[in-house]
């Protein structure tokens, strides 16, 4: 399981897909369902439903089942545990990575998979941060601008060492605490 922070949105997934694809092709990225309709990349995606979607609970259970089956077959799962792009709390503040979802801890613990943390540096533009404070629709519209803007910039994610399973196992009784630890560990990579 590869866990990563999510400061840029779509760009983060594109970079991880490129890096992993150089080594192996049995990876799947947990991503919003609107991205899974692109035929050329469909095989590398597992859709994560938006909470407001019809049958969101059923779709969420299906997503978890697919992810666990893929892991049990020896595949790689890529997940952005915050589930959202990092954003500033004010118009001019720094982007902050949201709390990480305890579902990731449960998936890690149930699967027994090796965990590799990845940290992306930087953040989306100030325009994006301001749009985020004004309107979700405006924010979403600017995400494509951010992708185009990022294409011409070098990206250098920091890939951490695989985590010692005993460190994760020591936190098995507290999934939320496990994710706080894993988030801090990932954001601390340098």
Descriptions of predicted regions:
Residues 4-56:
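Catalytic core of membrane glycerolipid acyltransferases/transacylases, capturing the structured
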Residues 60-190:
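Non-catalytic C-terminal accessory region of glycerolipid acyltransferases
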């Amino acid at each position: 399981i590869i866990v990563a922070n999510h400061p840029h949105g779509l760009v983060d997934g594109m970079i991880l897909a490129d890096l992993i694809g150089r080594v192996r092709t049995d990876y799947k990225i947990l991503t919003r369902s609107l991205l899974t309709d692109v035929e050329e990349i469909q095989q590398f995606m597992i859709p994560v439903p938006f909470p407001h979607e019809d049958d969101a609970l059923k779709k969420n259970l299906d997503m978890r089942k697919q992810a666990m089956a893929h892991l049990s077959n020896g595949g790689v799962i890529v997940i952005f545990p915050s589930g959202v792009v990092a954003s500033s709390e004010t118009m001019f503040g720094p982007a902050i990575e949201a709390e990480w979802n305890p579902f990731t801890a449960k998936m890690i613990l149930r699967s027994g998979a090796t965990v590799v943390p990845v940290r992306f540096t930087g953040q989306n533009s100030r325009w994006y941060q301001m749009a985020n404070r004004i309107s979700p629709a405006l924010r979403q519209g600017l995400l494509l601008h951010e992708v185009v803007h990022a294409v011409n910039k070098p990206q250098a994610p920091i890939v951490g060492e695989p985590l010692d399973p005993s460190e994760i196992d020591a936190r098995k009784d507290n999934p939320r605490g496990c994710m706080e630890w894993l988030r801090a560990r990932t954001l601390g990579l340098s």
